[in-house]
Amino acid sequence: MHLLQEPVNKLKFFHALVAGGVAGMVVDIALFPIDTVKTRLQSELGFWRAGGFRGIYKGLAPAAAGSAPTAALFFCTYECGKQFLSSVTQTKDSPYVHMAAASAAEVLACLIRVPVEIAKQRSQTLQGNKQSGLQILLRAYRTEGLKRGLYRGFGSTIMREIPFSLIQFPLWEYFKLQWTPLTGFDSTPFSVALCGAVAGGISAGLTTPLDVVKTRIMLAERESLNRRRSARRILHGIYLERGFSGLFAGFVPRVLWITLGGAFFFGFYDLTTRILGATSTDH
């Protein structure tokens, strides 16, 4: 049985790799302007000083370069983790399996995501001036080192991503399971996209304060207090400075971006998986 199962696992791994990469790149490029607006709203500089509506595509290059490998690594880990945990626990479609697999996937994906976010967000808020994404990363490494430069905000990014995934993926899997019983229609890439949009929008709204903290830490200048403050102290400082609205800065573009992104991402992921599955069956 193990020998028969092995090629299927490898095939699923390959499908997740390709489908995740395609879906991630499509989303990041198509919805990049919304992400820029969100980042500038959350910046310590304020929206207009961070660039306003100028240069709305600044930072696209590092985002495009990093989106495919980040998404591919995430979905490979998620699908393989889900398959492994389901076999170990002898359960199928358990929300706890989805939560554990998504959490592990987020930690690994952040190894690529965090340096990409550093380059992208500093470009978006015009901190990189006319430097390329690679130049921004090299400068961060030379002046601040690996941990405080290239991987600044690693902890706060995980602190944002894991709660986000703990909400999003069980919801997405649950909505997919309920689609046919509730509607009477078979699952399609469109239905998967719709489920992803709703799950993503809910998750994005609830985790906005964590996203604000992550943005503040990544954009902090060398002399900024945010470089040395804990996430809790940064949240408290934002609340004292701007009140409740400060904690949810960028709420509308974040929810819009991830709702649309969820539709694109999960829809393209499902479509690509189906195409690859049909191709491998033909051969």
Curated annotation (Swiss-Prot):
Gene3D superfamilies: Mitochondrial carrier domain (1.50.40.10). Pfam families: Mito_carr. It is found in: Mitochondrion inner membrane. It is a multi-pass membrane protein. SUPFAM superfamilies: Mitochondrial carrier (SSF103506). Disruption phenotype: RNAi-mediated knockdown results in extended lifespan. Solcar repeats lie at residues 11-84, 93-178, 187-275. Its main location: mitochondrion. Belongs to the mitochondrial carrier (TC 2.A.29) family. This is S-adenosylmethionine mitochondrial carrier protein homolog. It comes from Drosophila melanogaster (Fruit fly).
